[in-house]
Amino acid sequence: MILLEVNNRIIEETLALKFENAAAGNKPEAVEVTFADFDGVLYHISNPNGDKTKVMVSISLKFYKELQAHGADELLKRVYGSYLVNPESGYNVSLLYDLENLPASKDSIVHQAGMLKRNCFASVFEKYFQFQEEGKEGENRAVIHYRDDETMYVESKKDRVTVVFSTVFKDDDDVVIGKVFMQEFKEGRRASHTAPQVLFSHREPPLELKDTDAAVGDNIGYITFVLFPRHTNASARDNTINLIHTFRDYLHYHIKCSKAYIHTRMRAKTSDFLKVLNRARPDAEKKEMKTITGKTFSSR
């Protein structure tokens, strides 16, 4: 299985090139790039007000207001410090870098810029991991509508943090492959007792979402992660956040890869069968052609 990159490579490569050229004393060039990411996220890299010595990185998330309620602004201020500026129009967060005043730790700054989406997501997880660590119960469940028709729920108890993703399967085939995929997660936990518990429910929401407006339907699935203190403590939480916030994309990416592989194998098998059929086809009988005198025509 393939782990999706947590960082955004386009941001990192663009900034790294800008920093490298600036350090070499090269004339700065204009940049204007708009590109998308998973979950409807949109990025914009540009020169604000046409100033080529400044590079702005902006991100737009449809669900950013919900993240703000869980401390997203405070976390980003802690991580990015003075690089965090007022967001440009149409975006939620903007970072500004001055090519005439390069930071000493360029690699670290570039990497953190590439982690912008992850760091926006991280606030809700850090908040509930902290609740669990402090033994708090009864806090309201976090509800993040991270896609138009899909939702993430986070809830903490004294001994665990429960994260539930709802997801929509577009085809019946996706449901079948998704079930097989989730079964592999269950099998994997038997081999590693330190892995979190993973549950999958189809059509109906899990008990954790009882008495909520969680969606119900034949194409609806719910993936539940039960995270214990060994997954949420200070030394492990960063890696946990890296992995869990991309899980929905990870699942659907592998469903698509599985379908593509199956189709490729089907085409290969069809081609093999056609070759066998062509070899088995009998040759057409050659009719002997004779003249009126009884002589036989011979082909030249």
UniProtKB/Swiss-Prot annotation:
List every position bearing N6-acetyllysine: K275, K295
Which cysteines link up through disulfide bonds? none
InterPro entries the record matches:
ARPC2, ARPC2/4
What compartments host this protein? Cytoplasm, Cytoskeleton; Cell projection; Synapse, Synaptosome; Nucleus
- GO terms under biological process: actin filament polymerization; Arp2/3 complex-mediated actin nucleation; positive regulation of actin filament polymerization; positive regulation of lamellipodium assembly; positive regulation of substrate adhesion-dependent cell spreading
Keyword Nucleus among UniProt keywords: yes
Q: Does the keyword Nucleus apply?
A: yes
- Cellular component annotations (GO), alphabetically ordered: Arp2/3 protein complex; cytosol; endosome; focal adhesion; glutamatergic synapse; lamellipodium; muscle cell projection membrane; neuron projection
Q: Which UniProt keywords apply?
A: Acetylation, Actin-binding, Cell projection, Cytoplasm, Cytoskeleton, Nucleus, Synapse, Synaptosome
Note the superkingdom of the native organism.
Eukaryota
Coiled-coil annotated residue ranges, if any = none
Extract the PANTHER family matched here: ACTIN-RELATED PROTEIN 2_3 COMPLEX SUBUNIT 2, ARP2/3 COMPLEX 34 KDA SUBUNIT
On subunit structure and binding partners, the annotation says:
Component of the Arp2/3 complex composed of ACTR2/ARP2, ACTR3/ARP3, ARPC1B/p41-ARC, ARPC2/p34-ARC, ARPC3/p21-ARC, ARPC4/p20-ARC and ARPC5/p16-ARC. Interacts with SHANK3; the interaction probably mediates the association of SHANK3 with the Arp2/3 complex. Interacts with DNAI3; this interaction reduces binding of the Arp2/3 complex to the VCA domain of nucleation promoting factors.
Q: Which family does it belong to?
A: Belongs to the ARPC2 family.
Q: What does this protein do?
A: Actin-binding component of the Arp2/3 complex, a multiprotein complex that mediates actin polymerization upon stimulation by nucleation-promoting factor (NPF). The Arp2/3 complex mediates the formation of branched actin networks in the cytoplasm, providing the force for cell motility. Seems to contact the mother actin filament. In addition to its role in the cytoplasmic cytoskeleton, the Arp2/3 complex also promotes actin polymerization in the nucleus, thereby regulating gene transcription and repair of damaged DNA.
* Protein name as catalogued: Actin-related protein 2/3 complex subunit 2
- Origin species: Bos taurus (Bovine)
